[in-house]
Regions:
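ATP/NTP-dependent adenylation/nucleotidyl-transfer catalytic domains that generate, transfer
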Residues: 414, 421-426, 430-437, 441, ...
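Cysteine-centered catalytic environments shared across enzyme families
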Residues: 1-344, 460
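Residue-level signal for inorganic ion chemistry
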Residues: 28, 85, 212, 314, ...
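Short, active-site-adjacent segments that bind or coordinate small-molecule cofactors and metal centers
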Residues: 151-153, 157-166, 171, 366, ...
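ATP-dependent adenylate-handling active sites, centered on carboxylate activation for C-N bond formation
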Residues: 8, 165-167, 175-177, 233-461, ...
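ATP-dependent adenylate-handling ligase core
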Residues: 299-360, 366, 386-393, 417, ...
Length: 738
């Protein structure tokens, strides 16, 4: 793929664009291009560029990783385009619209300009100057782009500039990255790190479900919301028909991604990557085009599980496999590259990135420029352990796909592109995703078997039953790189793996606000994010006047300010009547205040199992351009309760409302023996151990991030009936910790 950037209404745009292109050097080594309003230059490197006179307020830049023909960018016709794209149906689009194009990017700009002319003819502008936009309403242009992109099959991130307008968009799943800033003009780039050195402070990731328009003359922004996939209507055909359709779509997703040159496959020997490799072997490659599988792991006496299994599968299926094994010292050197690349010290994220990076290094040494990945199968087909605890599997799959751009695709893109390798992800094919989200949950999770339909497909293909039944192991564990990070952290005297990784990336991952209820879940979720090097800028508390609110915790919520003081974190409070129609708007106002006052980039929630809460929070945050983190999502409830106690949280039950509980539970500290009792009640009557069914609410008195603890000096216990009681804390103060 490629790297794109642009700077508009900024005095030193040319200098900033060149700096951004240099930061993204490995995204494209075939050509570099840059243009302004009246000039365009291409060269093999920045030193060879020769600039003509022209305005430097507005500049587009591009780094080319050429895969289909050799078309330099920016491309200039009536307007100008920079694109990081791989469009698999560009030839079909050319036939449909009668357009001759040299490659997919060339097709994209020609198609945009064809559609633009249609808008002009509909308005009969009659202007002879083709270089201006003729005052077509912004909403019409954005809608046209949305309709055009709906016809495109593939992945992309692009910018189109015509006259006083520029538009940016990315594929609907966010496989190709795009970041932007609107502080003092407008800037964008394929990677966040390309904008950081330019002094931008409000860098945001473009939501793939938005098309973004910028008016140069008025310095204004317009966005257009794109429709996403749906889990309805669910497929009702017999299961054998669904299996046939699924296999056909998967085979097509693989075959359309075949490049015209030798390629690689990220291979763990697990279900997802082995199915991809087997299909690549059997679908009929082009003459002379072959592939190699690559896997990586820690070099130690015992083979890492993924390396051992990859070797067995490769031998059994006749696959060409190369293994990259690295020792502890080399792991540390790789971490110096990987952690700044992914711009994160999140331990699982770094572990996965390290595994991929090592495999990509081996592929790069072989001259590989395209690799296939099995990414997306777990999100699409319920492949994680947490899916086994889900009551609404397809809604969870939908949420995973909706947010996959925040969690996985940017990491994978920057790691592969740093090795000058384009990553292709068949499981995230648009048609396949649309189909799979509507597959009945029972065909994804059957008994205790996840990804059931993919396992069935593997057996239908003739793959070994052993493979089809193999349980998933995350890449960082299967490669043993997580173990290596642990050893390095211990050797360095770091308290945690995150502390050790901070030396490679000294910034906080993101600035976050916490939807703070005063209870155990929001407190624990915040602690987890702090431990992962996220900066907690503020707490956000919604004080509901409705005691029966499904959205917001109400017991003793007025004491959230005391908890905030104990932690030394600012608190934003918003009162709501708790009416279903208005409480989300009140929450949105509070989060918007946090964004404006503290510059937060995301929200932390303590959601465990409530889709009702999580989906509404995600909808609000989507509208505000914020990411959502729910680190407790689908955690085992007994595990959560025991972890809270083991790491030093001190909390009481502030209310109870369930058979098996009574007033003796409220107002006193919860201990291990109480968790034992809750577990027995769960076994006997199905009571939720962590109170997820509304059995109880909690109030935190102390925790690892509290500088002082809360001492309750007076409280009132109110018994409503035999199984329902609550406590009102009437006097509480902060005291020094022992």
């Amino acid at each position: 793929m490629c790297g794109i950037t642009g700077f508009f209404n900024i005095e030193n745009s040319l200098e900033l664009a060149l700096r951004a292109l240099e930061t993204m050097r490995n995204r494209g080594l075939d050509c570099i291009g840059i243009c302004g309003a009246g000039w365009l230059e291409h060269a093999t490197d920045t030193e060879s560029l020769k600039f003509q006179q022209g305005s430097e307020l507005n500049v587009l830049g591009h780094r080319l990783h050429s895969m289909v023909n050799f078309v330099r960018q920016p491309i200039a016709y009536r307007g100008r385009l920079v694109a990081n794209c791989e469009l698999y149906n560009w030839k079909e689009l050319g036939e449909k619209y009668g357009i001759e194009a040299e490659n997919d990017a060339d097709m994209l700009i020609k198609l945009i300009e064809l559609k633009w002319r249609e808008l002009e003819r509909a308005r009969d502008t009659g202007s002879p100057d083709p270089s201006v936009d003729h005052d077509i309403p912004e909403t019409d242009v954005l809608r046209m782009l949305d309709e055009l992109l709906a016809e495109v099959t593939g992945v992309y991130a692009f910018a189109y500039w015509l006259g006083d307008r520029i538009y940016i968009a990315r594929d609907i799943l966010g496989i190709k990255p795009l970041w932007y800033s609107t502080s003092g003009g407008f800037a964008f780039a394929s990677e966040k790190k390309a904008l950081v050195p330019t002094g931008r402070t409000d860098i945001k990731e473009l939501n793939p479900r938005e098309i973004f328009g910028y008016d140069l003359q008025n310095d204004t922004v317009t966005t257009f919301n794109r429709s996403f996939f749906s889990i309805q209507p669910e497929h009702t055909q017999p299961v054998e028909n669904i299996k046939v359709d699924f296999r056909s779509l998967l085979e097509n997703a693989v075959s359309v991604r075949f490049p015209d040159e030798r390629f690689g496959i990220l291979f763990s020997g697990g279900l997802d990557s082995t199915v991809i490799a087997y299909l690549c072997k059997t679908l009929g490659k082009k003459p002379g085009i072959d592939f190699t599988c690559y896997t990586a792991g820690l070099s130690e006496v015992q083979l890492p599980p993924d390396v051992e299994y990859a070797q067995r599968m490769a031998q059994e299926l006749g696959l060409d496999l190369k293994v990259k094994r690295i020792g502890l010292e080399e792991v540390e050197e790789y971490l110096r590259q990987v952690v700044p690349l992914v711009e994160d010290t999140n331990v699982p994220k770094v572990g996965v990135a390290l595994t991929m990076y090592a495999a990509c290094v081996a592929a790069r040494e072989d001259g590989i420029r395209v690799m296939f990945s099995g990414s997306g199968a777990d999100e699409l087909l319920a492949g994680y352990d947490r899916h086994k605890r889900s009551a609404e599997i397809n809604r969870d799959c939908y949420a995973d796909i909706l947010k996959i751009y925040e969690r996985n695709t940017y990491r994978d893109d920057v790691v592969s592109m740093n090795n000058n390798i384009e990553l292709r992800v068949p499981y995230l094919d648009k048609r396949l995703v649309d189909y799979c989200l509507k597959i009945p949950a029972g065909y994804k999770m059957r008994a205790d078997t996840n990804k059931w339909i993919l396992r069935e497909t593997a057996m239908d293909l003739g793959l070994p039953e052993e493979l089809s039944l193999r349980k998933k192991q995350a890449a960082q564990y299967g490669s043993r790189f997580d173990k290596a990070i642990g050893k390095l952290a211990k050797r360095a005297g770091a308290g945690t793996k995150t502390e050790y990784l901070k030396q490679f990336y000294d910034r906080h991952n993101l600035k976050l606000g916490v939807l703070f209820s005063s209870g155990k879940d929001s407190n624990y979720a915040m602690h987890i994010m702090q431990e992962q090097n996220y900066s907690i800028e503020c707490l956000i508390t919604i004080k509901s006047q409705n005691p029966d609110s499904y959205m917001f915790h109400t017991p003793n919520i007025s004491l959230a300010n005391l908890q905030a003081e104990a932690m030394g974190i600012p608190l934003i409070e918003e009162t709501t009547r708790g009416e279903k129609e208005t409480e989300l708007e009140d929450m949105k106002n509070a989060i918007l205040r946090a964004k404006k006052e503290f510059g937060i980039e995301g929200i932390v929630t303590g959601a465990l199992y409530s889709n009702y809460q999580r989906e509404r929070i995600e909808k609000v945050c989507d509208e505000l351009g914020l990411k959502v983190f729910s680190p407790l999502w689908h955690i085992d409830q007994e595990k959560e309760m025991r972890q809270l106690l083991s790491i030093g949280f001190d909390f009481i039950f502030s209310s109870v409302a369930a058979y098996g509980l009574d007033k003796s539970w409220v107002g006193r500290r919860i201990e291990e023996r109480d968790v034992d009792r809750l577990v027995r009640l769960n076994q006997k009557i199905g009571l939720n151990v962590a109170g997820e069914g509304g059995e109880f609410e909690s109030f935190v008195l102390d925790g690892p991030m509290y500088n002082k603890r809360i001492e309750v000096r007076a409280m009132e216990v109110i018994e409503l009936d035999e199984y329902t009681a609550k406590v009102n804390i009437t006097d509480a103060v902060l005291v020094d910790k022992d």
